[in-house]
Amino acid sequence: MKNKGFIAAASALMLMSPFASAGNPVQMWKCNINGDVAEEAVMAQAGKWKAAASALPGGEGMMVWSLYPVAVGADGDGTDVKLVVAWSSFTAYGQWWDAYPASDVAQLERETMTCHGSALWESEDA
């Protein structure tokens, strides 16, 4: 009888361990700057976007970076900037993503740049 309890507990731990050790979600958008918009305008707009996006459910503590190429080869997509967003958990990301597409925040990203693709990554501390 003790073996059954031990096996059940060990099985539950094995099933739950991927969730306990899950890293943080990071989404990266590949974007083109619209026309002759300056980098400073893109950064200012990214700040406005972050403030509005952080107010959505799951957005608390969200981190946002704008990445500009310094020395690169062509990526084939004409990417001028990458918008990188990280959340504290996949639960927070899920809440945020459920609210984002229908929100006014989604329109803000189009004021200075047009994003043509994104990928969701899992980050792990080294």
Predicted regions and their residues:
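Bacterial N-terminal signal peptides that target proteins for export
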Residues: M1-A8
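Helix N-cap motif at beta-to-alpha junctions
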Residues: D36-A38, A86-A92
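Short, flexible helix/strand-to-coil boundary loops that buttress conserved ligand/catalytic motifs
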Residues: W97
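Glycine-rich beta-strand-turn "strand-cap" elements at beta-sheet edges
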Residues: A22-V26, N32, G61-T79, D104-A126
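Short amphipathic alpha-helical segments
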Residues: A38-W65, Y100-V105
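Hydrophobic helical h-region of N-terminal Sec-dependent signal peptides
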Residues: A9-L13
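Macromolecular interaction modules
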Residues: G23-N24, V84, G94
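N-terminal signal peptide c-region/cleavage motif recognized by signal peptidases
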Residues: S17-P18
